[in-house]
Amino acid sequence: MKPFTIHRGKTAGIDRANIDTDQIIPKQFLKRIERTGFGQFLFYDWRYLSDGTPNPEFELNRPENEGATILVADENFGCGSSREHAPWALQDYGFRVIIAPSFADIFYNNCLKNGLLPIRLDKEDVRYLLRQSERADYELTVSLEEQRVFDDEGFSRPFDIDPYRKQLLLKGWDEIDLTFVYEAHIAAYERRHCPRP
């Protein structure tokens, strides 16, 4: 995974609550075994009309949202079935951060395990960010080290994250990488405690 320390990026807002994983990445696109290539299917049923052409009314299809790396949405983002493909699709599309008042627990943890930073902010703060996200030039800075989200206009809010998950993101590690860090300790433990022939 890529280390996450500070990220500055354009925001895009989807002003909807209860966006479920079936909307994030529809089931017909889950047959792939790679972790890449899912971005083209992100929000497929909303992004495309029935004839396959882009839906000009959908937020992410608007020109002002092109290149956005921070997604702002309403509460209970990522509810529904547990599919790790949802964070993969968001990342593959280009998002590094998702901001919402609340997330479904499994989705939240899947994001952290895959290097996508989900940030919970108060509903009023999210409403403000959704309004600001309508501007083509609006950017946010996210400092994981300081656990803070801020813009150039005076908005600044702290956010909470589990210290263990924070360290993994800062280093760009997943749980397998962490195991390799302790490989010598694990081998020493096995030598001391495993039965010998």
Swiss-Prot record:
Function description: Catalyzes the isomerization between 2-isopropylmalate and 3-isopropylmalate, via the formation of 2-isopropylmaleate.
A GO CC term attached to the entry: 3-isopropylmalate dehydratase complex
Similarity comment: family membership: Belongs to the LeuD family. LeuD type 1 subfamily.
Entry's Gene Ontology BP terms: L-leucine biosynthetic process
Pathway: Amino-acid biosynthesis; L-leucine biosynthesis; L-leucine from 3-methyl-2-oxobutanoate: step 2/4
Any Pfam family: Aconitase_C
Organism: Geobacillus kaustophilus (strain HTA426)
Coiled-coil region: none
Subunit: Heterodimer of LeuC and LeuD.
UniProt-listed SUPFAM superfamilies: LeuD/IlvD-like
Protein known as: 3-isopropylmalate dehydratase small subunit
GO molecular function, one term: 3-isopropylmalate dehydratase activity
